[in-house]
């Protein structure tokens, strides 16, 4: 998803 929280949870 394209959410503001998704950008912060991009720890792959």
From Swiss-Prot:
GO cellular component: ribonucleoprotein complex; ribosome
GO molecular-function terms, A-Z: rRNA binding
rRNA-binding in keyword set: yes
Record keywords: Ribonucleoprotein, Ribosomal protein, RNA-binding, rRNA-binding
Function: Protein S19 forms a complex with S13 that binds strongly to the 16S ribosomal RNA.
Family: Belongs to the universal ribosomal protein uS19 family.
Name of the molecule in the record: Small ribosomal subunit protein uS19
Taxonomic path: Bacteria, Bacillati, Mycoplasmatota, Mollicutes, Acholeplasmatales
Gene, per the UniProt record: rpsS
